[in-house]
A protein has these predicted regions:
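Ferredoxin-type iron-sulfur electron-transfer modules and their immediate structural context
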Residues: 1-2
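Acidic, serine/proline-rich low-complexity intrinsically disordered regions
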Residues: 5-248
Length: 248
């Protein structure tokens, strides 16, 4: 990766968002240098597993080390849906599967899934690292912020700083789809959009009540970092917000 970009972001993040949690990033690889997640001893939800990464422990995941079938699918390691998925996401089947009731009917779920983007992982593993732990050989594809409202407001505004159209999307989906699948695929678009996420009610128990995610394709992230020192971040308006950011 571009070490100059890494160092520049760390310096500017401390200057304009001092105390806010550092983002994490992911990349795909066939190498096994980073320790692999053990689903037998870790939580089933990928968002729960990422707490370790946010605290500074890099983790590698593959098709056999993600406990949730949804996590495997949205990381690109499985193309299949779990049995009765359309009922699981909607009304359920008494005595068979409890429904999450996130969609009104099984029929609606089927139509939604027809339009849901397909995605196959380019390599055998996905590796998550906190931004400050990335090294020169890493090639991050997406940068993920776990952010409280004031920080989120800053990121959202910065993402739109050099855009004519809206720079941020908020697609319906699981917590893991909002930080992996959607922003990864956005990285292939021109221009790429940031993805606001963690609206998944099932994933929210694994983040603080005030936390949302803000996932940024690396090409977009590069531009955002370059724009920081000429944006609203240098104004007295932002200084008022910056001064009340509570350390994570």
């Amino acid at each position: 990766m571009n070490i100059a970009l890494k160092d520049m972001f760390l310096r500017l993040w401390k200057k304009y968002f001092d105390g806010a949690e550092l983002p994490i990033a992911f990349y795909y690889t066939n190498e096994e240098k980073v320790a692999e997640n053990d689903p037998a001893t870790s939580g089933r939800c990928l968002i729960e597993n990422l707490i370790k990464v946010r605290m500074g422990t890099p983790l590698r995941f593959g098709k056999n080390s993600i406990g949730c079938p949804g996590g495997r699918r949205y990381a690109g390691f499985s193309a299949t849906l779990s049995e009765n998925f359309e009922y699981f996401l909607s009304c359920g089947i008494p005595g068979v599967v409890e429904g999450e009731r996130y969609k009104k009917s099984p029929e609606l779920v089927r139509e939604v899934m027809k339009k849901f983007p397909e995605f196959e992982a380019p390599n055998n593993f996905i590796v998550f690292k906190r931004w400050d732990q990335l090294d020169e050989s890493d090639e991050p594809k997406v940068v993920i912020f776990f952010a409280k409202p004031d920080v989120l407001a800053g990121l959202f505004t910065l993402a739109n700083f050099d855009e004519i159209e809206e720079g941020v999307l908020a697609p319906f989906g699981s917590g893991c789809s909002s930080i992996i699948l959607h922003p990864y695929l956005e990285g292939e678009n021109n221009p790429p959009h940031c993805v606001l996420g963690m609206f998944d009610i099932s994933a929210r128990p694994y983040v603080h009540s005030e936390i949302q995610t803000f996932a940024v394709p690396i090409a977009k992230f590069d531009r955002m970092v370059e724009n920081m020192q000429e944006s609203f971040l240098i104004t007295s308006t932002w200084e008022k917000i910056r001064n009340r950011i509570i350390p994570s």
